[in-house]
Amino acid sequence: MKHRVVGRRLDRTTEHRTAMFKNMVTSLFRHERIVTTTPKAKELKRFADKVITQAKRGTPHARRLAHRNVRDVEVLNKLFDTLAERFKARPGGYTRIVRVGRRAGDNAEMSVIELVDRAPAAAPEAEEKGEKKAAGKAEKAPKAAKAPKAEKKPAKKAAKAE
C-alpha cells in the first residue's frame, strides 16, 4: 500500500530525479514552455508552482530557497522580477499541462507544460513551422480532388452475360 508516498520515481535514482527536475524547472522558467512526457510534466508542475510561490514572497530568504532549484542566476532574476510580478494576483495554478499526443519512437504520451500567463511573443518557432505544414497540406488537398476518375463500366460482366 502506498500510504503517505508522494511523487513519482520515474525509474531514476533520487539524485538523477532531483537534478532532472532542477534542470527542467530552470528550462521552464527560461522558455516559459517545454515539451516533455506527461508523468514528468505532472511532477514538474509541483516543483514549479512551489518555486513561483517562493518568488512571490520576494524576500532574500525566499531567493535562497528558490536558488536551490533554479541554479541559473539569469533565470532566477527573471523569476523574481518578471514572473513574480506577473503572478502576483494569482493564488496558485501557475502552470498548465496540455497533452499533445504520443512520441513516435517509444509511443510515450507527450505534454506541453507552460506558464499560464505566458507572453505571446515567447512562442517557439516549432509552432510556426507546424502551422506552415498544416497550411501546405490544406492547399494540396483541393488539387487531388480536382480531377475525378472516370467510372469504369463492367465490360467483362456484360460480355459474359450475352
From Swiss-Prot:
It comes from the Bacteria. One of its GO terms (cellular component) is cytosolic large ribosomal subunit. Residues 118-162 are annotated as: Disordered. Residues 126-162 have a biased composition (Basic and acidic residues). InterPro entries: Ribosomal_bL17, Ribosomal_bL17_CS, Ribosomal_bL17_sf. GO terms for molecular function: structural constituent of ribosome. Keywords: Ribonucleoprotein, Ribosomal protein. Transmembrane segments: none annotated. Part of the 50S ribosomal subunit. Contacts protein L32. HAMAP family: Ribosomal_bL17. This is Large ribosomal subunit protein bL17. It comes from Anaeromyxobacter dehalogenans (strain 2CP-C). The lineage of its organism: Bacteria, Pseudomonadati, Myxococcota, Myxococcia, Myxococcales. The gene is rplQ.
